């Protein structure tokens, strides 16, 4: 059966490491989503690849079983927030990209909700324990937020940011910086 303590890689590296277009695209994603390294992109690609593989395998099933399994997979992806409408089909699953998954990361949602000024500050607030989901501290910026948890994201109860959230301020040199309110 295997040792339960043995951890496995959750990603697959690109087949060819030096493709200029892919490197440029990955650099753009690193900046847009405030990722630490390309491994986080590869993990997102692997998760999406798994869902797309499941959707392709549905096409080979008999119609009765296919309808049941398709409904289960669409329901799971709706709950995760990767699909937007209940009438989603296998084609919608096959059109998912890693950007769809990166949009559901806690780091991205904290930034988009306005709890931080930058995507990088969102990562720092999460890793330092200032962010809670449903009242529970979450310290992983890569946490995938479900749709029902999205409105429950706030500062942690004992966080100093709860009473004084960060605000943008114009400093003397004309630079914009973070200042405690």
UniProtKB/Swiss-Prot annotation:
Keywords carried by this UniProt record: Ribonucleoprotein, Ribosomal protein, RNA-binding, rRNA-binding
UniProt GO cellular component terms: small ribosomal subunit
CDD domains linked: S4
Keyword Ribonucleoprotein annotated: yes
GO molecular function annotations of the record: rRNA binding; structural constituent of ribosome
GO biological process: ribosomal small subunit biogenesis; translation
S4 RNA-binding domain residues: 104-172
The keyword Kinase is annotated on this UniProt entry: no
Quaternary structure annotation from Swiss-Prot or TrEMBL: Part of the 30S ribosomal subunit. Contacts protein S5. The interaction surface between S4 and S5 is involved in control of translational fidelity.
PANTHER family assigned to the protein according to its UniProt record, in alphabetical order: 30S 40S RIBOSOMAL PROTEIN (PTHR11831), 40S RIBOSOMAL PROTEIN S9 (PTHR11831:SF5)
Task of the protein: One of the primary rRNA binding proteins, it binds directly to 16S rRNA where it nucleates assembly of the body of the 30S subunit. With S5 and S12 plays an important role in translational accuracy.
Family, as annotated: Belongs to the universal ribosomal protein uS4 family.
Name of this chain's protein: Small ribosomal subunit protein uS4
Organism lineage: Archaea, Thermoproteota, Thermoprotei, Sulfolobales, Sulfolobaceae
């Amino acid at each position: 059966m295997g040792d339960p303590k043995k951890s496995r890689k959750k990603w697959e590296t690109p087949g060819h490491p030096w493709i200029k277009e892919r490197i440029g695209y990955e650099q753009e994603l690193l900046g847009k989503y405030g990722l630490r390294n390309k491994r986080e992109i590869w993990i997102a690609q692997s998760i999406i690849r798994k869902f797309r593989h499941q959707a392709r395998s549905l096409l080979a099933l008999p119609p009765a079983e296919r309808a049941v399994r398709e409904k289960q997979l669409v329901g799971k992806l709706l709950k995760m927030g990767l699909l937007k409408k209940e009438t989603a089909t296998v084609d919608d699953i096959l059109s998912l990209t890693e950007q769809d998954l990166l949009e559901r990361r806690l780091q991205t949602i904290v930034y988009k909700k306005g709890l931080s000024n930058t995507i990088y500050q969102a990562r720092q607030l999460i890793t330092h324990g200032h962010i809670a989901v449903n009242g529970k501290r979450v310290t992983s910026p890569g946490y995938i937020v479900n749709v029902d948890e999205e409105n429950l994201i706030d500062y942690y109860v004992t966080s100093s940011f709860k009473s004084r959230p960060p605000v943008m301020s114009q400093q003397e040199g004309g630079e914009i910086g973070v200042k405690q309110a």
